[in-house]
């Protein structure tokens, strides 16, 4: 059956029109893409509106796009921004759906085999399915993804073949529909109607599609004919009205037609026989017994159920690819004329290059010791050269582009240095190392008195801890951000810094791309003259840029000599600052402070459920007002505390970090009130 794609145009919603360097950057990027340039680099400084520029390019070219981000946090931030720019179009989110993931591994030195263990986030799985569905169905699609996009996914050809097409008036009996749903790995559940399940009541079949979070489809049969199709709310049961046709997508990306599974089983048996012979010839009897037992169990499971635990290790056969060929990934679902935007490319590009090697070494050990067949090596992320081959026209976006991006762009970069707000890059001062701690203490006090914040970056964990203790002893409200802090707590700490719970944040690597704190007026870089990864040109520019969102932004570099990296970072920052000042003077622009609300970060999945958003309480999470009803007795207090704790952990588990932080604040207030009453 030919597949028809919806051709709706992108409609950009914004209260602002492009300004500063944005109009010029948009024009240059569009011209480059229309002239067939495969690679372009956008050098956009912090706060210059890079996302808005990219949104304008996508809207004007009207082409589907994938935006790659280096981590889940930044991907979520970009998803929220793109969702706001394109509320009428398909903006999707595609990141790893594991809350916890322990890959299968073997440690020969201790003869320890570690079974694969994983916890899948149901909401993110739904968003991944929604992302591939949008790429297959709609032209007006933007998928914001992490490097999870280069990992193996189900074969799109098999995925498309397995779809169940429903149409009013079609002749199909109930038994056929139920059999096809079972093939799509949907399960029947007449009690709990959840995502990926269906229920049957007489001649009515209700299906809750795996990629949907708020709409289910009802099939009403009259004998062997589909009499009516209608969408309804699975929670309330209220109808959204009839639809002429509907397509049910498989419950998972890894679903495979029965004939291909049977074909794969024969090839697996053949490989197993060859592997057994090899192991026996090399006197590896234990390994031979192990691989035989494990593989035969998998074959039986696939024969009976159509899948098995770890079925992805047989992806070479299931996708019909030859040895060494790249696995199917999200790139195989993209339309051929899609755009690829790599955000924070100086971090993301090296990440893409590093994924394959780590995965390969772990799997080679499993193969060598008889836990997996050699074909399991083809269940892998893309190699870098394969990624390059598959990537469509690409725009690299970074404040500090790396050598790879510059080489691919032929050394030509598109500058976006002037901010729409007129804000300038921070002033840079160099002060001697000998006075760095006491000088920092003095600067921190001045900033705290003016209700401003300070970021301090050190070289070692010990130095960061000692500095935090020293500042604390001298009355500075200070916190220390270190590598042991998880994502939820990190979001909470940054939120508390913005709210003024403390004034100084100390860390080792605070250049984290996308760390958006307009209240920070001072960045202090200790031991700036120690060459290395944390004091490279890019690291220094990124760290200095953390103060670029404040009217009084300043960076102090404590150093006894000016290193090559320092000189380059200072020269580049001064170049940008000079260009910004000239632009402002020529147009009479007065720099304006950013008033970004603390609550405007992200709620992963909020965009996916507009109804929930509309019904949500209007209060922002940044507001310290408690939303609970004040209990009257000790028992009521304990019940309320327990209830809020459960709610907080649920939000954290769903990656809704800001909601979790808001509930944490409520808990703290409730506990304080309880102790006062006691």
UniProtKB/Swiss-Prot annotation:
Superkingdom as given in the UniProt entry: Bacteria
Domain Helicase C-terminal as annotated: residue spans: 436-589
GO molecular function, one term: ATP binding
InterPro entries for this protein: Helicase/UvrB_N (IPR006935), Helicase_ATP-bd (IPR014001), Helicase_C-like (IPR001650), P-loop_NTPase (IPR027417), UVR_dom (IPR001943), UVR_dom_sf (IPR036876), UvrB (IPR004807), UvrB_inter (IPR041471)
Residues annotated to bind ATP: 44-51
UniProt motif Beta-hairpin: location: 97-120
Bilayer-spanning residue ranges: none
Alphabetically ordered keywords of this record: ATP-binding, Cytoplasm, DNA damage, DNA excision, DNA repair, Excision nuclease, Nucleotide-binding, SOS response
GO biological process: one example: nucleotide-excision repair
Main location: cytoplasm
Helicase ATP-binding domain ranges (all copies): 31-417
Subcellular localization, as worded in the UniProt entry: Cytoplasm
Pfam families recorded: Helicase_C (PF00271), ResIII (PF04851), UVR (PF02151), UvrB (PF12344), UvrB_inter (PF17757)
SMART domains: DEXDc, HELICc
Domain UVR: 638-673
GO cellular component: cytoplasm; excinuclease repair complex
Quaternary structure note: Forms a heterotetramer with UvrA during the search for lesions. Interacts with UvrC in an incision complex.
Record function comment: The UvrABC repair system catalyzes the recognition and processing of DNA lesions. A damage recognition complex composed of 2 UvrA and 2 UvrB subunits scans DNA for abnormalities. Upon binding of the UvrA(2)B(2) complex to a putative damaged site, the DNA wraps around one UvrB monomer. DNA wrap is dependent on ATP binding by UvrB and probably causes local melting of the DNA helix, facilitating insertion of UvrB beta-hairpin between the DNA strands. Then UvrB probes one DNA strand for the presence of a lesion.
Comment text on domains: The beta-hairpin motif is involved in DNA binding.
Family: Belongs to the UvrB family.
Name of the molecule in the record: UvrABC system protein B
Species this protein is from: Pasteurella multocida (strain Pm70)
């Amino acid at each position: 059956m030919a597949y028809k794609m919806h051709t709706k145009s992108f409609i950009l919603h914004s209260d602002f029109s492009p300004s500063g360097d944005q109009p010029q950057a948009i024009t240059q990027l569009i011209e480059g893409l229309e002239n067939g340039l495969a690679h372009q680099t956008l050098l956009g400084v912090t706060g210059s509106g890079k996302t808005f520029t990219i949104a304008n390019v996508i809207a004007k070219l009207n082409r589907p796009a994938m935006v790659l981000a280096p981590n889940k946090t930044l991907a979520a931030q970009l998803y929220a921004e793109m969702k706001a720019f394109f509320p009428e179009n398909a903006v999707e989110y595609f990141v790893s759906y594991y809350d916890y993931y322990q890959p299968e591994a073997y440690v020969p030195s201790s003869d320890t085999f570690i079974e694969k263990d994983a916890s899948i986030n149901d909401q993110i799985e739904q968003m991944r399915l929604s992302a591939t569905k949008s790429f297959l169905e709609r032209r007006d699609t933007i998928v914001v993804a992490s490097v999870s996009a280069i990992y193996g996914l189900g074969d799109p050809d098999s995925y498309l073949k397995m779809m169940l097409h429903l149409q009013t008036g079609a002749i199909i009996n109930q038994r056929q529909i139920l059999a096809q749903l079972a093939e799509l790995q949907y399960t029947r559940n007449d009690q709990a109607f959840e995502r990926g399940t269906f229920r049957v009541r007489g001649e009515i079949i209700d299906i809750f599609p795996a990629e949907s979070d708020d709409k289910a489809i009802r099939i009403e049969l009259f004998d062997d004919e589909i009499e009516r199709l209608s969408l309804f709310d699975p929670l309330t049961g209220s109808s959204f009205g009839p639809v002429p046709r509907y397509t049910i997508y498989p419950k998972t990306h890894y679903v495979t037609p029965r004939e291909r599974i049977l074909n794969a089983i024969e090839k697996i048996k053949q490989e197993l026989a060859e592997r057994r012979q090899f192991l026996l010839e090399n006197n590896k009897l234990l390994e031979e017994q192990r691989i035989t037992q494990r593989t035969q169990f998998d074959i039986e499971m696939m024969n009976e159920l159509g899948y098995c635990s770890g079925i992805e290790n047989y992806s070479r056969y299931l996708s019909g690819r030859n040895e060494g060929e790249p696995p199917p990934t999200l790139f195989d679902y993209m339309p051929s004329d899609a755009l690829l935007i790599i955000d924070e490319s100086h971090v993301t590009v090296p990440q893409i290059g590093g994924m394959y090697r780590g995965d390969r070494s772990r799997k080679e050990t499993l193969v060598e010791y008889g836990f997996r067949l050699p074909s399991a090596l083809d269940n892998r992320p893309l190699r870098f050269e394969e990624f390059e081959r598959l990537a469509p026209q690409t725009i690299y976006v970074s404040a500090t582009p790396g050598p790879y991006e510059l080489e691919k762009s032929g050394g030509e970069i598109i500058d976006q240095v002037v901010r729409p707000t007129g804000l300038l890059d921070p002033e840079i001062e160099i002060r001697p190392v000998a006075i760095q701690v006491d000088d920092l203490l003095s600067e921190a006090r001045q900033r705290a008195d003016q209700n401003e914040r300070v970021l301090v970056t050190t070289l070692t964990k010990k130095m960061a801890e000692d500095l935090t203790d020293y500042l604390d002893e001298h009355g500075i409200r200070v916190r220390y951000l270190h590598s042991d802090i998880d994502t939820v707590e990190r979001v909470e700490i940054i939120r508390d810094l913005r709210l003024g719970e403390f004034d100084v944040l100390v860390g080792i690597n605070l250049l984290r791309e996308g760390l958006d704190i307009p209240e920070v007026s001072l960045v202090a870089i200790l031991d700036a003259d120690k060459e290395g990864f944390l004091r490279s040109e890019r690291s220094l520019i990124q760290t200095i840029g953390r103060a670029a969102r404040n009217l009084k932004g300043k960076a102090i570099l404590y150093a006894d000599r000016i290193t090559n990296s320092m000189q380059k970072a200072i020269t580049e920052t001064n170049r940008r600052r000079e260009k910004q000042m000239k632009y402002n003077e020529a147009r009479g622009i007065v720099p304006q402070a950013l008033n970004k609300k603390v609550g405007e970060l992200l709620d992963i999945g909020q965009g996916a459920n507009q109804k929930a958003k509309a019904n949500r309480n209007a209060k922002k999470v940044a507001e310290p007002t408690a939303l609970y009803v004040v209990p009257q007795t000790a028992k009521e207090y304990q019940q309320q505390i327990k209830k809020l704790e459960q709610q907080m952990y649920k939000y954290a588990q769903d990656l809704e970090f800001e909601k979790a932080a808001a509930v944490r604040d409520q808990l703290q207030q409730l506990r304080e009130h309880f102790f006062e009453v006691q």
